[in-house]
């Protein structure tokens, strides 16, 4: 038995409504995973971050709920540096050893996504990574609860949700 954390994505009989309904009809009974591992270079701020995922023949569906404070979000362009905003990341590896996909989204619903074939760090970034194109991103359904840019940083407690499909 492995000590590697695992989450089994269940098949859904109904497509989510993309309304952020964490406990709604589609998402309510879906098992939750909590984010417990953080990048070593990140700040000491550790908001309570939970996620759920489902799939059907059309797409993979992901929802995140974040209990946060010190929220800042300024990036609004596809593949911009959302890592500098309040954001979440979803990684998956369709076939072991054949690369992985990284979907990073800020609380405004701004996406930074790529297919990583070689994760080796170079001065320019990763060894080989192909960013999602605008026409591909347009095929995704996205919901975000934060309506617009958050600047300056908001130090008040807030809960934010992002929900999206990956066709």
Show which residues each predicted segment covers.
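Structural preference for beta-rich elements and adjacent junctions enriched in aromatics
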Residues: 1-167
